[in-house]
Amino acid sequence: EQGFENSVVGADKAVVVVNPEITSVRDADRVIGKLDAKGLEDHAVIVNRLNYEMTKRGDTLDVPDIIETLSVKLLGVVPDDRSITVSTNKGEPIVLDDKAQSGQAFKNIARRLNGEEVPLLKLGSESTGLFSAIRRLFKKN
């Protein structure tokens, strides 16, 4: 409790990071309630480690459910990306990897924090690429 109190003293804005898991969303809901009780109502959420395939199968919560549950604005979605592990082990920031969706997601979040209007990335197999397009064609038939 005291750590939370110390972290919000003097804050005028808060960013809550949540994983697409029920326990994480419950914890985030408690934190948002405490922020509101402290009068800190300017807050947003980042959904971290979103696995598109698991979400599509219904194995994890999806972004609209998370946002509806928490009743906050969405600042960004960071996909669960193996590139993060690789870049971390190399000691290199993921934002330097132009091919990593997670790196682009972090850049977009930073731009949104600076007031820019940046659309959310399309995540998962429905994004781009020849094989994705072929897969979608076969799924329709």
Regions found by a protein language model. Name each.
Residues 73, 92, 108-141:
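P-loop NTP-binding site
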Residues 62-65, 101, 129, 133:
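Exposed alpha-helical structural elements
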